[in-house]
């Protein structure tokens, strides 16, 4: 979301919108608010709604779980607790967050149930993952236990966190690349809301208090009533609205036994002031072009990093940095941190995110439809880019996927036969404020990584499912289960250049504050060219990062050839750090 006013001194829990400036009232009559209706993930043939349905069902299937019997030490003040949870939701990109008390009338007489949950729950109980990612066994065991346990009583839940996710604008008439996303605005926002509510409910349970997520497709409570009671929406007699969200929104909530501080409901007189509504980055740009002016970058035929492609060897998944740590190649200290995924589980926010990340592994590579639909490569690329940006990806690039970009063997040692020759690289922005506030070796750093990895796993998985529905093979390569080397593909697709800080690809608009993911496919696509924005000349002359690096990991020397690539290498003695 673009910045509306300076937030240098604005606390994160206050959110990006100045809702504190809106008039409030002490209480509100909820009897006039219409009952919530379930959102069905149904749409015309070819719509992205169908591809989103399975991922929405997965989030609905894991919305509840086992509560940690040991309660953590948290602030005793309900206001401090509320601010913490609001900040977490804002960090997860919730547009608005509100809190209200949960009243008996807020419970649905007939709870809403996603009809696809039963199928997903059976998959969680019976399917086996192929990945050996650290801690995947613990995640899958937890998920199996959760879906095998019937939902318990929630009458002891006294409070609700309510989230609103702004809907993007509707595609313009004849806008290129938008055939898949027409009519999917609410479904897209509901999916993102489901992600946040599922993560925060799990987070509260990890702290030792019972909590359950409620979405537009599966809910035990009336989200419309909660939205009005928490100040997230106003019922104007016709529609639920918020003064700052002119395109509408989708709702999600977390009910909990944890005591929180309720917000005051909005007064019916609340109106939009000039310049305060959400500014849509796509108001004057097509979805296929992205929010950033990528079209202004200088395009070149070859990446600025030399690649000796005939001599680039394929390496096994066992050579992956996380695998090396897990198997003890980098010393006993790092092996201990990697055991069971402890480096993620030691912080509750990242542990909460990793649960959903593990669940999506089962959805990464679905079978293609039996009938293949012909789509021109240029049209297919526009459809994929527009859909990805519409869903919330921050940057998308398309390139060939050479055989040397694939691992030679998977985590189990089985040979990998490259099935796809096309790569769709995607980037999730980790956020300037988050990067600025983290030391890189704290719980913030882990949570910001897991947030970005989870977001790609969700959105990349949806795009892969859409391609599979057209009859082409596709796979989302995530941090939990990937079979390709991503940095070279980012270079080929024009995301950025290699800098002195190592193998991280630096983007001219996002810098290094990004996490990437790749969807590979055999669907013919039009490719993007690599870019050259002067990074190589700049890094050769600057050396400031090498001088200031506290661990000495960044070297000041020239590039060296390694595995067929010309790179500036990280100091080997500092790799365990």
Positions of PLM-derived features:
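Auxiliary alpha/beta "docking" domains used to position bulky ligands
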Residues: 1-536
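Local cysteine-cluster metal-coordination motifs and their immediate loop/turn environment
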Residues: 270, 537-555, 571
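Active/binding-pocket-proximal capping segment
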Residues: 536, 554-567
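Single conserved hydrophobic/aromatic residue that forms the stacking wall/gate
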Residues: 568-577
């Amino acid at each position: 979301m673009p910045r509306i006013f300076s937030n240098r001194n604005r606390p994160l829990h206050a959110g990006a919108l100045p809702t504190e400036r809106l008039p409030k009232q002490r209480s509100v009559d909820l009897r006039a608010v219409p009952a919530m209706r379930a959102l069905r993930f149904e749409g015309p043939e070819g719509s992205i709604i169908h591809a989103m349905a399975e991922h929405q069902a997965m989030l609905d299937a894991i919305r509840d779980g086992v509560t940690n019997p040991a309660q953590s030490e948290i602030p005793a003040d309900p206001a401090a607790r509320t601010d913490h949870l609001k900040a977490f939701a804002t960090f997860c990109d919730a547009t608005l967050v509100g809190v209200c008390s949960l009243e008996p009338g807020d419970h649905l007489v007939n709870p809403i149930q996603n009809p696809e949950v039963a199928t997903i729950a059976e998959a969680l109980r019976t399917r086996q993952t192929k990945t050996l990612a650290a801690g995947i066994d613990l995640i899958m065991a937890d998920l199996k236990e959760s879906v095998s346990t019937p939902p318990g009583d929630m009458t002891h839940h006294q409070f609700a966190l309510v989230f609103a996710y702004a809907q993007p604008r509707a595609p313009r008439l004849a806008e290129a690349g938008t055939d898949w996303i027409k009519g999917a605005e609410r479904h897209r926002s509901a999916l993102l809301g489901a992600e946040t509510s599922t993560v925060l409910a799990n987070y509260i349970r990890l702290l030792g208090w019972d909590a359950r997520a409620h979405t537009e497709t599966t809910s035990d409570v009336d989200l419309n009533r909660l939205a009005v009671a928490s100040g997230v929406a106003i019922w104007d007699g016709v529609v639920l609205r918020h003064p700052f969200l002119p395109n509408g929104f989708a709702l999600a909530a977390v009910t909990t036994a944890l005591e929180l501080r309720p917000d005051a409901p909005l007064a019916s007189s609340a109106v939009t002031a000039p310049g305060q509504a959400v500014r849509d980055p796509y108001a004057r740009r097509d979805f296929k072009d992205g929010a950033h002016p990528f079209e202004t970058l200088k395009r070149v035929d070859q990446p600025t990093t030399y690649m000796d492609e005939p001599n680039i060897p394929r390496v096994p998944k066992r050579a992956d940095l996380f695998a090396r740590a897990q198997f003890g190649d980098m010393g006993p200290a790092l092996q201990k941190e990697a055991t069971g995924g402890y480096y993620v589980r030691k912080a509750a926010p990242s542990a909460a995110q990793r649960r959903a990340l593990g669940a999506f592994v089962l959805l990464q590579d679905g079978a293609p439809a039996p009938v293949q639909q012909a789509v021109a490569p240029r049209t297919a690329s526009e459809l994929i880019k527009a859909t990805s940006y519409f869903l919330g990806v921050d940057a998308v690039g398309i390139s060939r996927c050479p055989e040397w970009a694939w691992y030679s063997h998977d985590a189990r040692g089985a040979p990998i036969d490259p099935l796809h020759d096309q790569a769709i690289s995607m980037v999730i922005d980790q956020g300037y404020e988050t990067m600025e506030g983290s030391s890189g070796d704290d719980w913030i750093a882990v949570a910001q990584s897991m947030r970005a990895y989870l977001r790609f796993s969700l959105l990349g998985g949806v795009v892969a499912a859409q391609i599979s529905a057209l009859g082409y093979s596709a796979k989302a390569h995530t941090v939990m289960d990937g079979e390709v080397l991503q940095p070279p593909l980012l270079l080929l697709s024009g995301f950025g250049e290699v800098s002195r800080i190592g193998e991280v690809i630096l983007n001219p608009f996002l810098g290094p504050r990004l996490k990437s993911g790749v969807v590979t496919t055999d669907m013919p696509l039009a490719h993007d060219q690599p870019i050259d924005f002067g990074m190589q000349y700049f890094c050769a002359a600057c050396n400031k990062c090498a001088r200031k690096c506290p661990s000495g990991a960044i070297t000041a020397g020239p590039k060296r050839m390694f595995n067929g690539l010309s790179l500036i290498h990280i100091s080997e003695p500092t790799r365990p750090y």
